[in-house]
């Protein structure tokens, strides 16, 4: 710690406590000498030699035809088998005999060969050896079973016969343990019988199949017949329902035509009663109104008819009475409308040009619904419905029209010319009040307005 550190010069104004770094002279780096690259030697490409054409393949030589084979030597024909006896045709309806199993058949036709002991009686004379044919064996077995021959003492077996196999009717206990030897003929018989039984079974199975097919066909035919009958019944029911529907339509058409004829007669009578005056447009409107009324009445009649058909007899009679009342009421309304229309036509016919123009303006004029709604709400102090405002607008239109017409008549009475004055309107309003023809929203007019 003996070394002293240099003190910083505080008096120097530009000293910041850090010594300025002296720029180090960069050593000139030695430039690397780059050795020039040797120019690449361009290789001269040798032209490729054309390939030699491939040798064409020689056509294959046709194969040598194989030596004709030697004809086969025809084998010796087998001796024709003995024809089988014709089968007895069995009735299909006869009961089937109980079939015997193969074991039972083998037990019946088996031949047990045992050397008889000395002193035993010889076998029955009808027994045959193993070389006998099928027919002789069957006949011998049947005769031996049916008529057994009685043994005799004199018929003793010779030494040559004792070595042969003989048939014994009842085998002894020693022979019971030995296996029975079956002859070839017995095997053939068994096979033939099995074949016959199999053929019979096949025939019976075919007969059963035929019976089943016949029964199935009968069932199908019956089902088809039943289906056809059901379809016929459905068609009959549909035709009946169609006929009922047509009848009801005819009734409705008749009622509609009757009502039309009534309306036409009534309109003709009304036209005759009137002066016969009126424009073509008004007559068309009258006919349209009458037709609409008649159509409404026809609709009500048709509805009432459909209701009366569904109800009982008493209800139908009451419904007919109600329908008559409805017809009378609609008839009265149509009469009133026709009279009013005829009166209007007569008045319009006598209008002057000025009156016709004023009438057209009157028809096309209307009050604003918003203004009428405000007036009604201020009077009633309650919200007003849109429909009520429309109705009140129509009433106001009629009321104002009456006042204007009355004021014009008053102006003519006073023999004044010019437009309508307020005094004319006041006089008209006074006269309407006296006649109690001022519209009001209540039934009775208040005393203040009288």
UniProtKB/Swiss-Prot annotation:
One of its GO terms (molecular function) is protein heterodimerization activity. Residues 249-263 have a biased composition (Basic residues). Belongs to the TFIID complex which is composed of TATA binding protein (Tbp) and a number of TBP-associated factors (TAFs). It comes from the Eukaryota. Residues 17-97 have a biased composition (Basic and acidic residues). The lineage of its organism: Eukaryota, Amoebozoa, Evosea, Eumycetozoa, Dictyostelia. This is Transcription initiation factor TFIID subunit 11. Keywords: Nucleus, Transcription, Transcription regulation. GO terms for cellular component: transcription factor TFIID complex. The keyword Transcription applies. PANTHER family: TRANSCRIPTION INITIATION FACTOR TFIID SUBUNIT 11, TRANSCRIPTION INITIATION FACTOR TFIID SUBUNIT 11-RELATED. Residues 158-184 have a biased composition (Polar residues). Residues 1-329 are annotated as: Disordered. TFIID is a multimeric protein complex that plays a central role in mediating promoter responses to various activators and repressors. Residues 103-117, 126-152 have a biased composition (Low complexity). Pfam families: TAFII28 (PF04719). Transmembrane segments: none annotated. Residues 192-212, 226-243, 268-329 have a biased composition (Acidic residues).
